[in-house]
């Protein structure tokens, strides 16, 4: 390629990467900004040397302009030292974007991810939508580094999405939208025009699917998937059939924040960019310098009003009816804990009172997950896991963050995905 063509190509890529954002975003009212500042501080102060480094948190910190420089440095160094062989494609993609947002060279991580994705194929048509989440993140990260080399992978991904009949989860659809929007904006000069048509068609299908999950109060899917969905709907070049009211969504999210719904650092990491008017497409444009905002003090932002101290009763059931598992059971216990206690306290009290409720946990980027109850453990090969429900509704938070109410019936159900 001639030097002039190469230069023009890169200029057009840069321009495309920063333009085409539709005016479908909204901002936090100034008088509500202290609540957002408080969330950001809570997320940043959760970073410790002993925890697994979470690239999603570093991305959110950098997009929002970090307050805690020490936490930023710690996460950056931890992610730079991470072994690519230990990471899934999705984790590797997030690590690349996190390091890029910290103005660090991801090094060989990019070529490793590129090689992994060149051999990517869906496990089978009709596979669960979650199997597209990691590849979508990978295409997003690779697109931001070299869209020309990513084009064949993205084309194969888009065609596969068009063949997929089952609806996507909001999270998967949102990340796929961000990935294909990046490719749509950065189609290399001289490429066939039908590539843009393909990405546009795939985006239309996905954003229409997301728009069908918009509830009357503006929440998209659930409150924890709304952050990624807001990013997707604010940048997609394809308008969804169902109109999205960004201000209504923002109003409801702020109301949920005031009620203390966002306490998990990972949940904050996914909503914070939208609260700051940013998306993952902004990662390459993050500037790094010595000037940073002065962090607000703890007295500068409000906190949710604590509940009164009293005991509540929680009805807790553990259930395993899966065929092929040796031990079948359905056992219920009533547990008394202090009002405002998290679900983990209920599990601990049930375990103390009855050995059948013995459980084990595993630490993930979303916090603790229950991996085993009554000696029945999750199994990736068999696609089994413990799902927690309130009545018949799956919980949107983990056991270390969900706060049950008086006489709520919580069920831990061993099931398959």
UniProtKB/Swiss-Prot annotation:
GO biological process, one term: cobalt ion transport
Modified residues (Phosphoserine): 191
Pfam families: Cobalamin_bind
UniProt-annotated binding residues for cob(II)alamin: 171, 222, 270, 365-370, 386-395
Cystines in this chain: 26-246, 103-288, 143-182
Family statement drawn from the similarity comment of this UniProt entry: Belongs to the eukaryotic cobalamin transport proteins family.
Protein name: Cobalamin binding intrinsic factor
Localisation: Secreted
GO MF terms, alphabetically ordered: cargo receptor ligand activity; cobalamin binding; vitamin binding
Organism: Rattus norvegicus
Post-translational modification comment from the UniProt entry: The N-terminus is blocked.
Primary localization: secreted
InterPro entries: Cbl-bd_prot, Cobalamin_Transport
Glycan attachment sites: 209, 311, 330, 413
Gene name as annotated: Cblif
Keyword terms of this UniProt record: Cobalt, Cobalt transport, Disulfide bond, Glycoprotein, Ion transport, Phosphoprotein, Secreted, Signal, Transport
GO cellular component, one term: extracellular space
This protein's record includes keyword tRNA processing: no
């Amino acid at each position: 390629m001639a030097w002039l063509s190469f230069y023009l190509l890169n200029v057009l890529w840069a321009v495309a990467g920063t333009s085409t954002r539709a005016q479908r975003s909204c901002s936090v009212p100034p008088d509500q900004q202290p609540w957002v500042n408080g969330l950001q501080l809570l997320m940043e102060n959760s970073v410790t040397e002993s925890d697994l480094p979470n690239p999603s948190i570093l991305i959110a910190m950098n997009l929002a302009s970090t307050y805690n420089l020490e936490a930023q440095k710690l996460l950056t160094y931890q992610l730079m030292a991470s072994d690519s062989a230990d990471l899934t494609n999705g984790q590797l993609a997030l690590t690349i974007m996190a390091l890029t947002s910290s103005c660090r060279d991801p090094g060989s991580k990019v070529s490793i991810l590129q090689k992994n994705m060149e051999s990517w194929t869906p496990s089978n048509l009709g596979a669960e939508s979650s199997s597209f989440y990691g590849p979508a993140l990978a295409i997003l990260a690779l697109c931001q580094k070299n869209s020309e080399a990513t084009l064949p992978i993205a084309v194969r991904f888009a065609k596969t999405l068009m063949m997929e009949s089952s609806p996507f989860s909001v999270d998967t659809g949102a990340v796929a939208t961000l990935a294909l929007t990046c490719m749509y904006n950065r189609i290399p000069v001289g490429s066939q025009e039908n590539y843009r048509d393909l990405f546009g068609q795939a985006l239309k299908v996905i954003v229409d699917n997301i728009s069908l999950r918009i509830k009357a109060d503006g929440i998209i899917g659930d409150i924890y998937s709304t952050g990624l969905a807001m990013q997707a709907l604010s940048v997609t070049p394809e308008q969804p059939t169902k109109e999205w009211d960004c201000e209504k969504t923002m109003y409801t999210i702020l109301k949920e924040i005031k009620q203390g719904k966002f306490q998990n650092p990972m949940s904050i990491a996914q909503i914070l960019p939208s609260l700051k008017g940013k998306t993952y497409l902004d990662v390459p444009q993050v500037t790094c310098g010595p000037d940073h905002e002065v962090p607000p003090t703890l007295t500068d932002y409000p906190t949710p009003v604590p509940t009164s101290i009293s005991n509540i009763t929680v009805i807790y059931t553990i259930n395993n009816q899966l065929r092929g598992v040796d031990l079948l059971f359905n056992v219920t216990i009533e547990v008394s804990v202090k009002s405002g206690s998290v679900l983990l306290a209920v599990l601990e009290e049930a375990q103390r009172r009855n050995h059948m409720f013995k459980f084990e946990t595993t630490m993930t980027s979303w916090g603790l997950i229950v991996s085993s109850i009554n000696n029945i453990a999750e199994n990736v090969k068999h696609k089994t896991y413990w799902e927690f429900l309130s009545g018949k509704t799956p919980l949107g938070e983990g056991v270390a963050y969900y706060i049950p109410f008086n006489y709520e019936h919580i069920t831990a159900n061993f099931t398959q995905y």
